[in-house]
A protein has these predicted regions:
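Short, Lys/Arg-enriched N-terminal segments with co-localized hydrophobic residues
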Residues: 6-17
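Extended, intrinsically disordered, low-complexity segments
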Residues: 16-21, 28, 248-290
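Alpha/beta enzyme core
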Residues: 22-31, 38-97, 106-219, 223, ...
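A general structural signal for well-ordered secondary-structure junctions
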Residues: 37-38, 272
Length: 290
């Protein structure tokens, strides 16, 4: 089913009144322009999206890994059509602005990045991120000039939309085993000039490195938290100038961790004490009521 059709059929199921896409696009951009940092959590299905909306979060972001795990696949194996249908389902679940993990634009060419932005808009999204590394194992980042061309093409596609779409450009050095801060900064500066609205270098773990990135660019910076060994609070991140904090697949992996602990308890001990940590049936049902 095409994302736009899925969105149209699912719209009535949304939790709360729906804003128009231009209104959501403007609201999402406003979050990046106000004082302080905000958290944009990453649901992996309509149910978790509605729970996060119920808890009062102001915007959501998809997680490619979290979604892949939910359908029994490793990260990086979901195609563009399925990704867009999934994004449309997240959009339709609530009235919140949604930004998507668009991987590398599902192709190496600048035209692939541009086309993915157009499809993201059709799916109801008001933001999306483009990575600078191929969707192949053990890949190095694209050569800088090619990476710039890809961001520039995506930014041009954004400018051709009829509403505000927030484009995030990602520098993947640290996630592909190349922890080069200078090259990361050089790339983010280039992506800024190519038209990115938000800059993001996942994998930065120290406050000093994050601060160095922020001081080197003049666009809002996203960081990812929820990584093991990284204990920086929202207040600490806001104090050094971070604007947006996502959590990637960590909510999904946290839920899967609880699932596996419960399953192993049953298998290994034949006991069911895990139930004491479960949310009550009444509480979870109430959260899903319109």
């Amino acid at each position: 089913m095409a994302p736009s059709v899925f969105l149209q059929r699912s719209q009535e199921k949304a939790d709360g009144p729906m804003s128009t896409q231009p209104e959501k696009g403007q609201a999402f951009r406003a979050l990046h322009e106000r004082e302080g940092a905000f958290i944009i959590p990453n649901p992996w299905d309509a149910g978790t999206a509605r729970l996060l909306a119920h808890l009062g979060f102001e915007a959501l972001a998809t997680t490619s890994a979290g979604y892949a795990f939910s359908v029994g696949q490793p990260d990086g194996t979901i195609g563009r059509d399925e990704t867009m249908a999934h994004a449309a389902a997240i959009v339709a679940a609530t009235g919140l602005p949604v930004s998507a993990d668009l991987e590398n634009g599902f192709g190496d060419a600048p035209a692939n990045a541009a086309e993915t932005i157009k499809l993201a808009a059709q799916a109801g999204l008001v933001g999306g991120s483009i990575e600078d590394v191929p969707r192949r194992e053990d890949s190095a980042p694209y050569e800088l000039e090619h990476a710039i061309d890809r961001v520039r093409a995506a930014a041009e596609a954004v400018r051709n939309l009829s509403f505000r779409f927030t484009l995030t450009a990602r520098a993947e050095n640290y996630l592909v085993g190349r922890p080069d801060l200078n090259d990361t900064i050089r790339r983010l500066q280039a992506y800024q000039e190519a038209g990115a609205d938000v800059l993001y270098a996942p994998g930065l773990t120290s406050k000093d490195d994050i601060a160095a990135v922020i001081s080197s660019v003049d666009r809002p910076v996203n960081v990812v938290m929820g990584l093991q060994g990284v204990q920086l609070s929202l207040a600490e991140l806001s104090a050094i100038g971070v604007k947006r904090v996502s959590v990637g697949s960590s909510l999904s992996r946290s839920a899967l961790g609880a699932f596996l602990r419960a399953a192993r308890e049953m298998r290994d001990h034949g006991t069911f004490s895990f139930a004491s940590e479960a949310v009550s049936f009444r509480d979870i049902s109430a959260m899903f009521k319109p």
